[in-house]
Amino acid sequence: MSTNKKQKCKQINKCARIFSVIICFTTLIFAQYQIGYYSTIFQDPDRSNRNIETKIYYPATIIDDSTVTAIGQFPVIVFGHGFLMSWDTYQNVWEEFVPEGYIMVFPTTEGGLFSTDHQQFGWDLQFLVTKIQNEGLNNNSPIYNSVDNNTALMGHSMGGGAAFLAADSLCNSGNNHLKTIIGLAPAESSSNGVSSIASALNITVPALILSGSQDGVTPPTDHHIPIYNNLSSNCKTFISISGGGHCYFANPNIFCDIAESSASNGISISRIEQQSISFDFLNLWLDYTLKRDCSYFSVFQDSLFNSNSITFDQLCLQNPTANIIENEGVLTSSIIGTGYQWYLDNSIIPYANEISYSPNIDGHYNVEVFFLSGCPTISNSYNFIIDLGVLEKFIPINHAIYQNYPN
């Protein structure tokens, strides 16, 4: 190839890469949703019709200057506020996640100075995990037909601790909505005879805890780390933001900031920096656990190992990979999962979604196994050749197979 042609090809390739970046960037911009909002009061019949005022933010679009619910179904994040911190202190949180395609649910209960009941707040969060599913079935609701099954519990400080109380009950009852729990500087809720640290023992869903290294309000060694250590999740991650504080996960709040100024020392990053670091990890984690996109887990892992802004601890057990077992012409996955997909020569076999599959042609077969949490795994290829001896068992006795010789 001539030098001019090589240079021309390089220019074309460079332009193609730039064009691809522009297209991707443009797609990301237009993929962002507007934010819809409404407030409602739910009643919990199991607690004497306790009133639970709830603020709900949801993905929306603007049509003719009116805000309407975006088309689609969106995962849910139920969020618990901190002690003496109103739900609107977390405007930074809903403005981050709702445009990315999440419904955010904020109970406003248990905001008093002397009457705060951590157990009741935990029950409020627990109640909303299932109640919001009913809201999606209510044709008078702004989020009618918009609620996805997958749900996260998330909370800050007191609300973080209460989220672990809620997850304890949900995991024990076998709730199938809760897919992950996230604590932002979660506080040990030891009042009212409960304990977030103790509750962590019963939590099995994937978990993520973010902590500021300089948090003096809920010191990590007394609060965040014991909760993390007690978790029974098969995938859990603890992230310590270097130089971070307790209150910087939220917007300014006079009560939290006064406590921080008297209890925390050595905070060396800004509120904006701490939130930026947090959102980088949270977006990846939520896309992995709630949107079930396993490619984001790989990016999450890369960020953990390459970030200079954090230190971390992690225990994540990988889901097992199946072997294919053949018995009399039937292929079976060696691993039991929640779902299956069989492949022939790297192509999906329609309706082949059971633990076993009976092939009728030669080829290379794989089985993909799905699990309650974590990523699916796919087996090594199995070369299947039809055994005529086995095939004869399925031929009626008054039929036979003959070689078709040419005349």
List the predicted regions and their residue ranges:
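Surface-exposed, proline-anchored Ser/Thr-rich loop/turn motifs
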Residues: 323-329, 344, 391-407
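The feature captures the conserved acid-bearing segment of alpha/beta-hydrolase catalytic domains
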Residues: 175-249
